[in-house]
UniProtKB/Swiss-Prot annotation:
Function recorded in the entry: Accumulates harmlessly in the cytoplasmic membrane until it reaches a critical concentration that triggers the formation of nanometer-scale pores (pinholes) causing host cell membrane depolarization and endolysin refolding and release into the periplasmic space. Once the pinholin has permeabilized the host cell membrane, the SAR-endolysin is released into the periplasm and breaks down the peptidoglycan layer. Determines the precise timing of host cell lysis.
Segments crossing the lipid bilayer: 7-23, 30-46
Cytoplasmic side: 1-6, 47-78
UniProt keyword Transmembrane present: yes
Protein name: Holin
InterPro entries to which the protein is assigned, alphabetical: Phage_holin_HP1
Organism lineage string: Viruses, Duplodnaviria, Heunggongvirae, Uroviricota, Caudoviricetes
Chief localisation class: host cell
Native species: Haemophilus phage HP1 (strain HP1c1) (Bacteriophage HP1)
Periplasmic side: 24-29
Keyword Chaperone set for record: no
Membrane topology type: Multi-pass membrane protein
Domain of life of the source: Viruses
Subcellular location as annotated: Host cell inner membrane
GO terms under cellular component: host cell plasma membrane; membrane
């Protein structure tokens, strides 16, 4: 037989034994940890997007204020 298949069969068997050895509460705790980590990652990405949106909005407001000040003849420090 192929040596790659021969070396993969024991690995697959040990992986199957490991998976079947877990009980329901162990699976629930593993999925809970996984879902918790994913939700923290999603919340962090959303937070970064919100911060960037606020920075962009502030930069736009500053630009509009400088344009209005220039129209009114007010000196601007750049």
């Amino acid at each position: 037989m192929n040596s790659k298949i021969d070396s993969a069969i024991p690995f697959i068997g040990s992986l199957t034994a490991l998976i079947s050895g877990y009980s329901l509460h162990e699976w629930a705790s593993l999925f809970g940890i996984l879902f918790g980590a994913v939700s923290v990652w999603i919340a962090y990405r959303k937070y970064k997007e919100d911060v960037q949106a606020r920075k962009d909005e502030l930069a736009y407001k500053m630009l509009v204020a400088k344009i209005e000040a220039k129209k009114l003849g007010i000196a601007i420090d750049e």
